[in-house]
Swiss-Prot record:
CDD domains: DHQS. It is found in: Cytoplasm. Binds 1 divalent metal cation per subunit. Can use either Co(2+) or Zn(2+). Its cofactor is Co(2+); Zn(2+); NAD(+). Zn(2+) binds at residues 183, 246, 263. Belongs to the sugar phosphate cyclases superfamily. Dehydroquinate synthase family. Pathway: Metabolic intermediate biosynthesis; chorismate biosynthesis; chorismate from D-erythrose 4-phosphate and phosphoenolpyruvate: step 2/7. One of its GO terms (molecular function) is metal ion binding. The lineage of its organism: Bacteria, Pseudomonadati, Pseudomonadota, Gammaproteobacteria, Moraxellales. One of its GO terms (cellular component) is cytoplasm. This is 3-dehydroquinate synthase. NAD(+) binds at residues 70-75, 104-108, 128-129, 141, 150. Catalyzes the conversion of 3-deoxy-D-arabino-heptulosonate 7-phosphate (DAHP) to dehydroquinate (DHQ). The keyword Cytoplasm applies.
Length: 362
C-alpha cells in the first residue's frame, strides 16, 4: 500500500492506494461519529456493499444505505434529494459521515450532500472507478449537473480520507477503464513529460488491468493533483490547469446528453481539440499533436466526436465555469508536459480545431 497526503493545514487527509485494502483498519481513525450513510449505486450494491457494511458494523457504527441508479444522467437535483431523504429518515445528525462508495457520479453527489446536510457533515471517499480514483475523489469538488451545463451546482467539500483499491477495478468494464485513462493522460500532458513516456511504455499493461501498473498510475496522478490542490484549493489559479480538455469535453457531453459519452471519452476528444489549437497557435509541433492523438487512441479512446453544430458547441462552451468577465479562458499546451490557462487565442483557429476533430458529416 502507498499513502499520499493532500496538504490543507488542519484539513490534511490521506489517500490510501493499494490492492485488497482493509477498510476496518484504514477507516477507523477517520469516521468520527457512530452514524454512517453509505451512498452507492445499483451496480456496486451487488458487488461491494456488504464488504463495507461488515467493516463498519465491526467498528460499532450505525449504518444506513442510500442506493441510487447507475449513470451520469442521474446526477441531478431529483436524485440528490434521495440522499437527503435517506439521511432524514435515518434520523442522522451533524456528527454523521456520508461515505461515497462508487465512481465520480456517486462521489460528486454524496460529497455535495455531505457539504449541505445540516450545513456540513463528515465525508469519506471510496472511489471504485479509475476515473474517480485519479481525479474526482481528490480535491473536494462536488456537485450535480443542470440541463444547461455540467457541474453547475455544487460546493467544495474535502473528504476525511480517500481509499483507492485497485482490486475493485477488476469489475470495471473496459470502456470505463479507458475513460479513467483519459484523466491519467491529462496529468502527463499538462505537467509531466516523463510520465507521458511511462504511459507510452506501459499502456498495453494498463489496458489489460495490471494492478501494479494501475497503482503506479493512480499514485502518480494523485500526487500531481494533491500538489496542485494544496497550492490552489478553490481554483483561483493553477488548479484550473486540471481542466485540460474539459471545456471542449463538457460541450460534447452537454450536447450529446449526459451519459451518452462517458466523461473520460469526452475529455479525451477535448484534449485532442486543445492540442490541435495549441498546434495552430504554433506552440506545439505536428509531431507533438500526433503523439497526443496516438496515446489517446492506444487507450481505446475517441479522438473525434460526432458532428455538433458549431454555434451550439460554442454556446455550451460559453457556460464553462472558467469564463471570467464574459471571456472564455482555455487550458492549452505551451509544450507537451506544460499547460497554461489563457484567454489570448485566435477564435477562428479555435473553431477550426473543433471542426477538424468531429467525425465527417457525410
Amino acid at each position: 500500500m502507498q499513502t499520499l497526503h493532500v496538504e490543507l493545514g488542519d484539513r490534511r487527509y490521506p489517500i490510501f492506494i493499494g490492492s485488497q485494502l482493509n477498510p476496518q483498519n484504514l477507516l477507523a481513525p477517520y469516521i468520527k461519529g457512530r452514524q454512517v450513510m453509505i451512498v452507492t449505486n445499483t451496480t456496486l450494491e451487488q458487488l461491494y456493499l456488504q464488504h463495507y457494511q461488515d467493516a463498519l458494523h465491526a467498528l460499532d457504527k450505525q449504518v444506513a444505505v442510500c442506493v441510487l441508479p447507475d449513470g451520469e444522467k442521474y446526477k441531478n437535483i431529483e436524485h440528490l434529494n434521495l440522499i437527503f431523504d435517506a439521511l432524514l429518515k435515518a434520523g442522522f445528525n451533524r456528527d454523521c459521515t456520508v461515505l461515497a462508495l462508487g465512481g465520480g457520479v456517486i462521489g460528486d453527489m454524496a460529497g455535495f450532500a455531505a457539504a449541505s446536510f445540516q450545513r456540513g457533515v463528515y465525508f469519506v471517499q471510496i472511489p471504485t472507478t479509475l476515473l474517480s480514483q485519479v481525479d474526482s475523489s481528490v480535491g473536494g469538488k462536488t456537485g450535480i449537473n443542470h440541463p444547461l451545463g455540467k457541474n453547475m451546482i455544487g460546493a467544495f467539500k474535502q473528504p476525511e480520507v480517500v481509499m483507492a483499491d485497485m482490486s475493485q477495478l477488476k469489475t470495471l468494464p473496459p470502456r470505463e477503464l479507458s475513460a479513467g485513462l483519459a484523466e491519467v493522460i491529462k496529468y502527463a500532458l499538462l505537467g509531466d513529460i516523463e510520465f507521458l513516456g511511462w504511459l507510452e511504455t506501459h499502456m498495453d499493461g494498463l489496458i489489460a488491468g495490471d494492478e501494479t501498473l494501475l497503482a503506479e498510475a493512480v499514485y502518480r496522478s494523485c500526487a500531481h493533483k494533491a500538489r496542485i490542490v494544496a497550492n490552489d484549493e478553490k481554483e483561483q489559479g493553477e488548479r484550473a490547469l486540471l481542466n485540460l480538455g474539459h471545456t471542449f469535453g463538457h460541450a460534447i457531453e452537454s450536447y450529446l446528453g449526459y451519459g451518452e459519452w462517458l466523461h473520460g471519452e469526452a475529455v479525451a476528444t477535448g484534449m485532442v481539440m486543445a492540442a490541435d489549437l495549441s498546434h495552430r497557435l504554433g506552440w506545439i509541433s505536428s509531431g507533438d499533436l500526433e503523439r497526443t492523438k496516438k496515446i489517446i487512441q492506444r487507450a481505446n479512446l475517441p479522438i473525434s466526436c460526432p458532428p455538433i453544430p458549431l454555434d451550439e458547441f460554442l454556446s455550451y462552451m460559453s457556460h464553462d465555469k472558467k469564463v471570467l468577465n464574459g471571456q472564455l479562458r482555455l487550458v492549452l499546451l505551451q509544450q507537451l508536459g506544460q499547460a497554461i490557462i489563457t484567454k489570448t487565442f485566435d477564435v477562428e483557429m479555435m473553431k477550426a480545431a473543433i471542426l477538424a476533430n468531429q467525425a465527417s458529416h457525410t
